């Protein structure tokens, strides 16, 4: 991290200004630049091309050095479109890697890969900037204690708990509630942990990025009236950007998150949507640089690139970065090198189910498909582990019986199976929960449910103490006391209707 004396955009000093090169070759987003002997820039240095194109329009393209080719040539990848660039144009070596603004000034704003605001809300304070290329924290700085990151979302905390400083894969198609779940997590970390969030939109649709921004403003995650009170910073490098920008936008978002962890000593949530696009962009850049492709056409450096990003996402003694990464699985093939490399880094998976979403059960997290390495008795305790296992067993038995119920009906089941089905249906409904960020749509006030309350609620359902209550009493409530109160209200209403 460095502190700049002025608030203007990073200025190239007169000393560095002397290190000028010339464009020798342009192939799409890749430039070859010739520098004077002995003045070669370092790998990952930012190069700036300024000038005018043939019709007199201003050009300002930032590139990143990727290879030193010999004969005083370097190969660089552009972070924006190379339209209008010509051979012979002057290139300035900035003498440092790309640096982006960090700190409280980034909250509530949208940035591109270069750390420039793109939301038309004026300039951002750039007195404090940080280079996007950093080494992962040293082993001695890490906090190796295994601790649960409580989200206040029942289904997540009970069945697939997140690790503080861990990495979670979020799997789900379009329209099953990924965005709402992401916004609820941003809201809950701000309220319960005093933390902030950084959202990295990597190679996804611009429309989705715009929708997310609008929904965040609507739900109060971004405070329009007082931007500084917002809980999230957004960094976008969408599908229409060159591969260089899509490859580096994840690092820009991570750099902003690292500042909140290391300097502000906060718990940070880092969202990456989509981690597959990071790999895809790396593959494009690798091909453009002329590297020999590896398995399925991916870059030979796939594991290294993924590792250098993922190893920076961790808990230190100052704070933590907990990362939630949306994972696109190409052609639903889990053995594809991109998702397979990602899985090696994940501590938990949250799988969203279209079947549950169709039933109106939100969050539509699949209780049987979602997993977590944290769900072990020595980490979460015997009580939590036992409750989670019994919930899964009951849900699994219900799933097995559904075919029989569809063909023969509920009456043909044994007494024991009928009881299992009744409890499983209550559990399914109790796994739903009203969200704070969905209040504006549903009219139901949001609920944050602590882990102890969650465990108590499911224990009561499994023990049979609540067998007499109607299953709709468990739908979209917070803790179990609300379910019993709702059951009483339903009883009163039914008596009045009679």
UniProtKB/Swiss-Prot annotation:
UniProtKB keywords: ATP synthesis, ATP-binding, CF(1), Chloroplast, Hydrogen ion transport, Ion transport, Membrane, Nucleotide-binding, Plastid, Thylakoid, Translocase, Transport
GO biological process terms on file:
proton motive force-driven mitochondrial ATP synthesis
Protein's name in the database: ATP synthase subunit beta, chloroplastic
Q: Which GO terms describe its cellular component?
A: chloroplast thylakoid membrane; mitochondrion; proton-transporting ATP synthase complex
A Pfam family annotated for this chain is ATP-synt_VA_C
Q: Which residues are ATP-binding?
A: 172-179
Please name the InterPro entries in this protein's record: AAA+_ATPase, ATP-synt_VA_C, ATP_synth_F1_bsu, ATPase_a/bsu_AS, ATPase_alpha/beta_chains, ATPase_F1/V1/A1_a/bsu_N, ATPase_F1/V1/A1_a/bsu_N_sf, ATPase_F1/V1/A1_a/bsu_nucl-bd
Q: Which SMART domains match?
A: AAA
**EC category name:** translocase
The protein's organism comes out as Chamaedorea seifrizii (Bamboo palm)
Q: Does the keyword Hydrolase apply?
A: no
Q: How does it sit in the membrane?
A: Peripheral membrane protein
Taxonomy of the source species: Eukaryota, Viridiplantae, Streptophyta, Embryophyta, Tracheophyta
Subunit organization: F-type ATPases have 2 components, CF(1) - the catalytic core - and CF(0) - the membrane proton channel. CF(1) has five subunits: alpha(3), beta(3), gamma(1), delta(1), epsilon(1). CF(0) has four main subunits: a(1), b(1), b'(1) and c(9-12).
Role summary: Produces ATP from ADP in the presence of a proton gradient across the membrane. The catalytic sites are hosted primarily by the beta subunits.
Q: Which reaction does it catalyse?
A: ATP + H2O + 4 H(+)(in) = ADP + phosphate + 5 H(+)(out)
| PROSITE patterns cross-referenced by the UniProt entry | ATPASE_ALPHA_BETA
Protein location: Plastid, Chloroplast thylakoid membrane
Give the protein family: Belongs to the ATPase alpha/beta chains family.
Signal peptide stretch: none
- The Enzyme Commission number assigned here is 7.1.2.2
The UniProt GO MF terms for this protein read: ATP binding; ATP hydrolysis activity; proton-transporting ATP synthase activity, rotational mechanism
């Amino acid at each position: 991290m460095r502190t700049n004396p002025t608030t203007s955009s990073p200025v190239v000093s007169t000393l560095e200004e002397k290190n000028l090169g010339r464009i020798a070759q342009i192939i799409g987003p890749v430039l070859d630049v010739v520098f004077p002997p002995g003045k070669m820039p370092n790998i990952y240095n930012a190069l700036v091309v300024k000038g005018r194109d043939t019709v007199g329009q201003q050009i300002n393209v930032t590139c990143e050095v990727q290879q030193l080719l010999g004969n005083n040539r370097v190969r660089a990848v552009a972070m924006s479109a190379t339209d209008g660039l010509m051979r012979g144009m002057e290139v300035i070596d900035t003498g440092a890697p790309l640096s982006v603004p960090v700190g409280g000034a980034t909250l509530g704003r949208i940035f591109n890969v270069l750390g420039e605001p793109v939301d038309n809300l004026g300039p951002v304070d750039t007195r404090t900037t940080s280079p996007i290329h950093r080494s992962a924290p040293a082993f001695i700085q890490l906090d190796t204690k295994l601790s649960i990151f409580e989200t206040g979302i029942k289904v997540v905390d009970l069945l697939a708990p997140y690790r503080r400083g861990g990495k979670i894969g979020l799997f789900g198609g379009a329209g099953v509630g990924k965005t709402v779940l992401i916004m609820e997590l941003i809201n809950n970390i701000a309220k319960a942990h005093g933390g902030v969030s950084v959202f990295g939109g990597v190679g996804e649709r611009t429309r989705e990025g715009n929708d997310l921004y609008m929904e965040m403003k609507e739900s109060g995650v971004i405070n329009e009236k007082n931007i500084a009170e917002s809980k999230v910073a957004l960094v976008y490098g969408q599908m229409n950007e060159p591969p260089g920008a899509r490859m580096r936008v994840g690092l820009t978002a991570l750099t902003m998150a690292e500042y909140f962890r290391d300097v502000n000593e906060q718990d940070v949530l880092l969202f990456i949507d989509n981690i597959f696009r990071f790999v895809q962009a790396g593959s494009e850049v690798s091909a453009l640089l002329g590297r020999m492709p590896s398995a399925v056409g991916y870059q030979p450096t796939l594991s290294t690139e993924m590792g250098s990003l993922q190893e920076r996402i961790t808990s230190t003694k100052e704070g933590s970065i907990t990362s939630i990464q949306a994972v696109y699985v190409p052609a639903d093939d889990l053995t594809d090198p991109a998702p397979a490399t990602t899985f090696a880094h994940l501590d938990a998976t949250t799988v969203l189910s279209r079947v549950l979403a169709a039933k109106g059960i939100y969050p539509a997290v699949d209780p049987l498909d979602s997993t977590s390495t944290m769900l072990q008795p020595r980490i979460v305790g015997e009580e939590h582990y036992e409750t989670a296992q019994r919930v899964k067993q009951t849900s699994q038995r219900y799933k097995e019986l559904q075919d029989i119920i569809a063909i023969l009906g509920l009456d043909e089941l044994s007494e024991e199976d009928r009881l299992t089905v009744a409890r499983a249906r209550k559990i399914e409904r109790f796994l739903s929960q009203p969200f704070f960020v969905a209040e504006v749509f549903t009219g139901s006030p949001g609920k944050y449910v602590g882990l102890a309350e969650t465990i108590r609620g499911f224990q009561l359902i499994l023990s049979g103490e609540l067998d007499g209550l109607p299953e709709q009493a468990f739908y979209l409530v917070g803790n179990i006391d609300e379910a019993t109160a709702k059951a009483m209200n339903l009883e009163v209403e039914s008596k009045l209707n009679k």
